[in-house]
């Protein structure tokens, strides 16, 4: 089997050689970036963070994190519409990430728990889904919450 590879240009990483099978297709794009449909996940070494890099625009890359690493009790149900759209057949098909905003004052780093990125890892399809759940904020302050969890 021949695996097609592409060179993806990235402002963060320079040139990345990416297998076509690692490209994730977001049919609806990501809110505010609806015109961008193809992304690839790049792992940061020795870090809980990943990058969701646009294949189509080198300047667009989101820092993302697995929310279960920072909030082990994070849970939600996906509606059938999303399950069908992503062709999910089992929980093993799914990877969940949340977008991270890291401002100049790193202590103000926040995670969007309200709108996780759901990926079917086998079908390479993704969506950013807005949860109808008041438990999860748009701005979950990472360091503030980690410190309060450690004190418990």
Swiss-Prot record:
Pfam families per the UniProt record, alphabetical: FliW
UniProt keyword annotation of Mitochondrion present: no
Presence of keyword Cytoplasm: yes
Keywords, comma-separated and alphabetical: Bacterial flagellum biogenesis, Chaperone, Cytoplasm, Translation regulation
InterPro entries: Flagellar_assembly_factor_FliW, Flagellar_assmbl_FliW_dom_sf
SUPFAM superfamilies per the UniProt record, alphabetical: BH3618-like
A GO biological-process term: regulation of translation
GO cellular component: cytoplasm
Subcellular localization(s) per the UniProt record: Cytoplasm
PANTHER family according to UniProt: FLAGELLAR ASSEMBLY FACTOR FLIW
Subunit text: Interacts with translational regulator CsrA and flagellin(s).
Family: Belongs to the FliW family.
Function: Acts as an anti-CsrA protein, binds CsrA and prevents it from repressing translation of its target genes, one of which is flagellin. Binds to flagellin and participates in the assembly of the flagellum.
Name under which the protein is recorded: Flagellar assembly factor FliW
Organism in which the protein naturally occurs: Caldicellulosiruptor bescii (strain ATCC BAA-1888 / DSM 6725 / KCTC 15123 / Z-1320)
Source species taxonomy: Bacteria, Bacillati, Bacillota, Bacillota incertae sedis, Caldicellulosiruptorales
């Amino acid at each position: 089997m021949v695996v097609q590879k592409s060179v993806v240009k990235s402002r963060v990483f320079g040139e990345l050689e990416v297998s076509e099978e690692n490209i994730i297709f977001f049919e609806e794009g990501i809110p505010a970036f609806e015109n961008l449909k193809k992304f690839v996940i790049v792992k940061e070494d020795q870090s809980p963070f990943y990058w969701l890099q646009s294949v189509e625009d080198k300047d667009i890359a989101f820092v993302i994190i697995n929310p279960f690493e920072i909030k082990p009790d994070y849970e939600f149900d996906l509606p059938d519409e999303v399950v069908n759209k992503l062709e999910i057949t089992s929980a093993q098909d799914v990877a969940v990430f949340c977008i991270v905003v890291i401002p100049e004052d790193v202590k103000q780093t926040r995670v969007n728990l309200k709108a996780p990125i759901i990926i079917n890892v086998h079908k390479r399809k993704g969506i950013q889904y807005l949860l109808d759940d008041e438990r999860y904020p748009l701005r979950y302050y990472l360091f503030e919450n980690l410190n309060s969890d450690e004190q418990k």
